[in-house]
A protein has these predicted regions:
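Gram-negative bacterial Sec-dependent N-terminal signal peptides
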Residues: 1-19
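N-terminal maturation segment of proteins
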Residues: 19-583
Length: 583
């Protein structure tokens, strides 16, 4: 079991006396984190905190109000701590905490808080995948899981009630993104309960710590719950979605068309980028990056012997040699590339994480409508590895030449390396497990794709075009996301822009544009974060000259976990100064 850093009441909201400002901050941070775990009991279990091991979250709007009210009380406590009495590390901690609390408070002020699902992430999908993050070693582990399954109907009703508020307030997802969403619900209703995703813990080998009789009894109880609680709830959700939600879907793709949408989008831009850049500024940065990358793509096409970028891309999109015939073949290719990457890591990093990662296929019921791949973090506390999920649907649109760039982003040195390393850092639990800034995390993932050049991964024009296509993909996001949500672009305009500029397949572009429409602002973080890391590397190289060490720079970037970009900039400036001082 994981212990929190300091003991204390979960909701100790009263303002403390100031005998020691740094100590007060530690107490506050741990109180905030304990409150967060109470609100996220499944995540708490994944971290080995078992006080709420049989619970699921409260999904009501009243719960959102409660979290915002608690954040305001915590913010009052933070404001009462004299910042000039904090040491340098505590000032960073306080700044990150302040940002998180303000985000909770401000986010709850928008009507868009009732938007509780996207086309690729909803409560039914999250709970169907819940088991992959939980420990299953003891009888108590399985009992807790069964208790959670029994709460499915309550969670379903709460989420439907919130979504009904979204319908009433005209905060629904756009119609153009909802194609096939019914299948993500109906796909979880299985004729054979033993093949249900909710039954997965019992489809695996019985752990030694559970008797055969207990395991059989618990499995039978889970079967009954899936049949009598979960399947009826899924049928209820499917009927509600078809009759109530889908007919009320939004006709405009941009969030700015919703009530208060322009203000909400500005909030989302600040949240995801951790900058003060406006949508217009970001749009222009995107156009500039698209032009630069396009020129590089022309050069690679010429090296490959093609008269134009478009001709080479057409070859890459249509030649059968670049595509797997079976899911197994695709997964084998991914596994081979990741093994090569693993061997290159020691030359680029001084510190490597201990937690391993594995590769799995994206579940079939969500694969058709979701992105190419994603990463699911592991847990050192309960011994669960990180997972790089690969989409094996629509094989004729999953080219081999994308695999190197995709793998360095999702696995190592990208998400797995960064997140698993963060879990080992001597930071507060709040920082290690609760503070994830998209601009840093995804910026690092995209920067890692560029590290593939130094690893020698892009050893053919096809693979290099794959890298450039992925970089172009993220540059296009700056243009497309702001175009849709700030400039009134249609979905087709967004698709046409990405088709004209990237080498992505039609299926990928469709899924990606749906994602940008459904999740305003999130896609902006990747390219802006990567540009900042590259800018800091250039600065450090210039300042340190022959003393610059790339592995040490990478360790410095990752050394304080996920941080806002302004904090990262100061962090690297401090590292450069310290390196200079070594003489």
């Amino acid at each position: 079991m994981r212990k929190l850093l300091l003991a204390g009441s979960i909701l100790a909201l009263a303002v403390p006396a100031h005998a020691d400002a740094n100590g007060d901050l530690v107490t506050l941070v741990n109180d905030v984190w304990a409150a967060s775990l109470k609100e996220q009991p499944v995540y708490a279990s994944a971290l080995g905190v078992n006080e709420h091991a049989s619970e699921l979250s409260d999904y009501t709007l009243a719960a959102q109000d409660r979290r915002a009210a608690d954040a305001a009380k915590f913010l009052t406590r933070l404001n009462a701590i004299p910042s000039d009495s904090l040491n340098a590390a505590s000032k960073v901690e306080a700044g990150i905490l302040r940002r998180a609390l303000n985000s909770t408070i401000e986010g709850n002020s928008f009507g868009q808080r009732a938007i509780n699902f996207t086309t690729y992430s909803s409560w039914h999908q999250q709970l169907a995948g819940m088991a992959q993050n939980l420990p299953f070693r003891t009888k108590a582990d399985f009992e807790s899981y069964n208790a959670r399954l029994a709460q499915y109907a309550r969670v379903n009703d709460e989420n439907i009630a919130v979504a009904n508020v979204a319908i009433k307030g005209k905060y629904t997802q756009p119609c153009v993104t909802l194609k096939g969403f019914e299948g993500t619900i109906s796909g979880l209703i299985t004729t054979d309960v033993n093949k249900s995703r909710f039954y997965e813990p019992y489809a695996k080998k019985r752990p030694a710590g559970v008797s055969e009789a207990d395991f059989a009894g618990l499995a039978k109880a889970a079967e009954a719950t899936i049949r009598t609680v979960i399947h009826p709830a899924l049928n209820k959700q499917l009927a509600w979605y078809t009759a109530s939600y889908k007919p009320a879907c939004a006709t405009a793709p941009g969030v700015s068309a919703q009530p208060g949408g322009a203000k909400y989008y500005a909030f989302r831009v600040r949240e995801e980028t951790t900058t003060s850049l406006t949508a217009e500024q970001i749009h222009q940065i995107g156009l500039n990056e698209v032009a630069r990358i396009r020129a590089e793509m022309v050069e690679v096409a010429s090296q490959a012997g093609y008269p134009s970028r478009e001709a080479f891309i057409q070859h890459l999109r249509t030649d059968p040699q670049y595509y797997a015939k079976t899911p197994e073949e695709l997964m084998e290719k991914v596994a081979r590339v990741t093994k090569i990457i693993d061997g290159k890591m020691p030359s680029l990093f001084g510190r490597l994480p201990r937690l391993p990662y594995g590769i799995k296929e994206i579940p079939a019921e969500t694969a058709e409508g979701t992105t190419t791949a994603y990463y699911n973090q592991g847990s050192p506390e309960i011994g669960i590895s990180g997972t790089y999920f690969v989409n094996t649907s629509k094989l004729n649109q999953r080219p081999f030449w994308e695999i190197p760039a995709l793998s360095v982003h999702e696995g190592v040195p990208g998400h797995h390396h960064q997140i698993a390393l963060q879990q080992e850092l001597p930071l507060s639990d709040f920082r290690k497990y609760g503070a994830f800034f998209t601009a840093f995390t995804e910026g690092w993932g995209l920067y890692s794709e560029r590290l593939g050049i130094e690893m020698g991964l892009y050893d053919t024009p096809a693979k290099d075009m794959g890298r450039l296509s992925y970089e172009m993909w993220r540059a296009c996001r700056l243009v497309v996301d702001t175009g849709i949500h700030a400039k009134g672009w249609s979905k087709q305009q967004a698709i046409d822009f990405m088709t004209d500029n990237s080498a992505l397949s039609a299926a990928n572009i469709e899924a990606e544009v749906n994602r940008y429409i459904s999740w305003p602002g999130q896609a902006l973080a990747y390219k802006l974060g990567e540009l900042k890391i590259r800018e800091l590397r250039t600065m450090a190289t210039k300042e340190l000259g022959p003393k610059f060490n790339l592995a040490a720079f990478h360790d410095a970037v990752l050394g304080q976990g996920s941080v806002p970009l302004d904090v990262l900039e100061q962090q690297i400036k401090d590292w450069v100064a310290a390196e200079k001082a070594k003489g």
